[in-house]
């Protein structure tokens, strides 16, 4: 506890001294640091994206290295008590206290940025460092912190920082705690400035991606989780830097936030939105900001105007060309094998329609074809419309006889009139050509310019740029040379004070020949604390060192810096240097990055040398601390190389330890030489000797293991290098891995670098230490830088240069503390002389070893990086090489001065970080507000659109429902109608069916009736036919043949006589057919008239019978009326027949041959013949059947009558012939000559009067 209190007291005194000692220097440091800080912030912004991407890769690599670092850190922690003793030995100067205070606020600014839990712990460590003056840091005992660190397995950066800070607090408990921690940050701040500068350069050169602070923090937290070692602390510190830069980037990207609203439908998350905005802003800022610088501005314009608007890809086309031209569109295609072919003898011209109206800035024309003539002079005309007769001649361009792309940029002054015109059509006319070939092909033509949109964006961006210029500059927009310029300005501000400090650094370097190791321990602890303060990196390094020793080292280191830069030389705290070594390597790449700007590195180196000589002599503690930090860094790099070389033997556990003890001795001597530090330093050195002796073994083993892990990685990168080289490369590789978790890599680098630098410091502890150490340091630092560059290249592969810059800066910061730590270890192990002797050998070895490492790392970097970042890295490497040569030519003090300037810049960079963080917070607030406004607007719009759509939908639904209801009603009505119609139809159909059934029944009945009637008719017809057949069958055919064939009718008499003979009772078979048509009226027909209808056929039997009884049956027909002769001879019956047999009464026509009554004396035969004749009359039947047999008297009377009538018969015959001449005669009737149809019955008859 006493040690802790002493250390705290020393630190507080140093901080007070730093504040009070040299205000002018403090101001200068602030300015330089601010410049570096601002530049660093810019680089951080650029580096954030790369770091974010690379952190993940490196975190994976760093996990093994973190374990190694944890082991190393444990060893460092054990060694740290000695450092604490040394710190106790060192008296705290007020100047140192002031310096620490100054650095403290810077450190506080760093921890202000909150990472994830692990990063937060790191931040806490840095904050405790910053607030080391406060009791919070002192409250936590280093032992408890160490325990926690040991428990954690991986030394989380925050915890080690906290541990170291409490130790410092305990030591400085007597003295103000704030001062001691502040001193450590102050010392650390210079490395941060270096780191910031390197990072800035790297970020500017390599910053391709930009990541939001939250994203970067998340990535950093992941990396920290992967390795909780001091490397993670370093990573967190870098993360803080990156965060500050990130905040700046959001501000820069503010104008681009408008881009996000372009997608109103898609509402991205804040991180996505911010990332997009930052990326857009980054592109714009990269193109716009360099405009302030002539060269970069041209580059910016080229970048902005690198759109070829005469390309087929964007829609350009050939509108017209000379008719001989072939494949005219080939000139718009980026294909070397395609070309427009024209004979040289023709007039070659063509018109191109560009993709869009642009302000023409440049023309490119090319002819790749061999054995052809290339264009020499060509006229270019422009127009805003086509076709046109007013082509504006832009000018005649003269080409070269080359078969490649020839560019013709337009001078804005000469073509100011045309450059501002927006044209879309270009006419090119080839006026002449080189050579005498037949063909003049043209392979390519390009037109570059600015479109209306780009011009508008430039104006808007320029306005926004003017508003946000500071923020952009701070973030990442400064060119690689920016830090150099700032450094120069800061250097100028430092002035003679810086030179005095540099001189003091030189003196300290001489002292460091013997005591550098002690100072190195103090510086190491201080740098570690500073690293933790600056970022978790410092915390990391502090954690690595033993809690108590590290505060002591910090106090000692701060005090030493305040007193003498030599006191804070690297040799002391090798354990911390190991942690710092990784950081140093990373930091060295950062430094290389700064150097990458070439001019910056060279100028800074020369300036540092001069200023270091001037200022270090006067302002040894403060300015030398900053310059000395770089100086320590170089020594650390040298010692790292030596340690790498020795790490092989160190793995065995022997070679590594002896050189460190030797280093410790020189540190003691240095501390003794220092007025205040000597006593405290001696004690602390003893402490450190013991602790370091033990820790060096552990550290050597751990360091070896860590190096082994690095070797594995390095084998891939540099398998050909020897183990030492591979170790150094591994350290470099480890920083890369650590760059993923920056803390881990930085810690391992610190420890390793710490050993080697301490050894180098021990070697240079002699009076020659200044020159030798400077040279060696320069060589080793350059080698280390090369390795760092290699690391950086790898880091660039894994991460963006921004991340590498942060890592490198962190490493540099850590390396300085590491350099401080190794001396105590060496002191404990070996006397000063031994340490010095060992150092030279180690330094030489390191030089040899590091030199190869440098070379290989450079080519590897070149191989690894092919991008502009690679070019930057190569430039940085060349710059580093030049810078290294300059450093060799110059003294180490000069380089230390450069580091000093960086340190001062770093201090200011811390303040600037705070400012940047504030601005970043403002930017974030503005972005958040803008994002919220955008979200609210989008939400409002979406809600309005949704509401409108909903209303429309409701209206449509209502309309649809109303239409549907109407349709339903109509359909319902139609259905009802259809149903009614259906019922009616059903009824109709049923009625029809019933009616049809009835009709069917009626028809069937009728049909049945008809059938029945037909049947009856048929039956009746058949019956009639049968009867007819029977009747006809009774007649005998002979009867007809027997009839007389005389043409004359028998006389009536004969007939009557024959009638007398007939048997009247016999019925005739054929009665006379009655016919109304043949009825004789009483007027016309007399009873005496006789109508013969048809001959009666009598069967022979009947004839015989009739003849037989003829005499007996013949009756005399007496007319009822007497016949009165008429004048014309007609005879009229007086009376109608009264007899029933009379014709009148009968009403029937009898067809028969009328014969007069037979004469009484006629024979029987004659009577028979007459009878036969008479029988032909239809009335015969009635006569025959109706007459009764007459008596003889009647027969006689009849005969007399017949005789009388015989004459009358003739008369009647004549009458009949005359009156009814149409009537056929009986003979005719018999013969069938004539037929008479009577009535419907078709009876043939003859009508006539009898």
From Swiss-Prot:
InterPro entries given in the database record: Galactose-bd-like_sf, Suco/Slp1-like, SUN_dom
UniProt entry tagged with the keyword Transferase: no
Disrupted gene: phenotype observed: Most mice die neonatally from respiratory distress (50% on a mixed C57BL6/CD1 background and 100% on an inbred C57BL6/129Ola background). Surviving mice fail to thrive and show significantly reduced body weight, skeletal deformities and spontaneous fractures. More than 80% die by postnatal day 10, and none survives to weaning.
Biased composition regions of type Basic and acidic residues, renumbered to the chain: 55-64, 206-218, 240-252, 271-286
Signal peptide: 1-19
Bias (Acidic residues) ranges: 164-177
One GO CC annotation: rough endoplasmic reticulum membrane
Residues where Phosphoserine is found: 1077
Free-text description of this protein's post-translational modifications in UniProt: N-glycosylated.
Membrane topology recorded in Swiss-Prot or TrEMBL: Single-pass type I membrane protein
Ranges annotated as biased composition (Low complexity): 120-144, 1159-1168
Spans traversing the lipid bilayer: 1007-1027
Protein name: SUN domain-containing ossification factor
Native organism: Mus musculus (Mouse)
Gene that encodes it: Suco
